[in-house]
Regions:
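Conserved small/polar residues in nucleotide/adenosyl-binding loops
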Residues: 1-5, 209-212
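Glycine-rich, flexible beta-strand/loop modules in the N-terminal catalytic cores of phosphate-handling
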Residues: 69-77
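Glycine-rich anion/phosphate-binding loops
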Residues: 50, 76-88
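An N-cap/entry alpha-helix motif that binds or orients negatively charged groups
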Residues: 4-54
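A structural preference for short, pocket-lining loop segments at secondary-structure junctions
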Residues: 56-70, 85-112
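Hydrophobic (often cysteine-bearing) scaffold residues that line and stabilize catalytic clefts
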Residues: 13, 82, 208
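Conserved catalytic cores of soluble enzyme domains
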Residues: 104-211
Length: 212
């Protein structure tokens, strides 16, 4: 297990996976997948793994399935193939009866893919609902988890929000008339912990300890 110093910059999507799994145990699935959309010149954009790394490994010898969103690829936004990788991972986890860990750092819906991206949200909700009570579901929020994506935290059994960069919200703080995040940051880890939405908070290193 490799744990990055909390004083350094944020870990990458792959580093987060490596930090929670046993050394050299991660097997990636769907590394060659890219965005399928061609609208708005999307075919000209490089979209490695379509912004989400998926696969399986072990924690203390026990099998887990994990996905980690990559904000360096279209902000980690959810599109058609991005969602299919996540739901495919859930199918495998259900067959094996193994937990699913989601590491969230996402700009939200990929607007260029329109209804295909919206459908992707729905398929993820459905898979998580079907898995509820059958396999443990854990969500860790390291960056933005906003709009429709915020539902994932409520569909999970346990939710972690990183104390500095984690933002969990349906609407931004300024959606409240006269409010802004300097008055009351309703997206912050502290607010969500007090509201009972998240189960624990801390820096990234703390999250790795909880997740393992």
């Amino acid at each position: 297990m490799c744990i990055r110093d909390s004083n350094t910059t944020q870990a990458s999507a792959r580093e987060r996976i490596e930090a929670i799994l046993d050394d050299n145990s991660f097997v990636e699935i769907g590394a060659g997948v890219k965005a399928r959309a061609t609208d708005f010149n999307m075919q000209e954009k490089d979209t490695p793994a379509d912004g989400v790394i998926t696969g399986y490994g072990v924690i203390n010898g026990s099998l887990v399935y994990v996905y980690s969103q990559n904000p360096a690829v279209l902000g980690g936004s959810i599109g058609e193939m991005h969602a299919k990788k996540i739901t495919g991972l859930y199918d495998m986890a259900m067959k094996m009866g193994a937990p699913v860990i989601g590491l969230i750092d996402c700009a939200g819906l990929r607007l260029q893919e329109a209804t295909d991206a919206l459908n992707g949200f729905g398929t993820i909700y459905r898979k998580m609902s079907l898995c509820s009570g059958l396999v443990p579901q854990i969500t860790a929020v390291y960056g933005s988890c906003g709009g429709g994506l915020a539902v994932l935290s409520e569909l999970s059994d346990f939710t972690f929000v990183e104390e500095k960069n984690g933002k969990l919200f349906v609407n931004s703080p300024n959606a409240l008339d006269g409010n802004n995040d300097t008055k009351l940051d309703t997206a912050s880890a502290a607010f969500q912990a007090e509201a009972g939405v998240s189960d624990f908070t801390g820096d990234e290193a703390v999250s790795y300890t909880h997740l393992t």
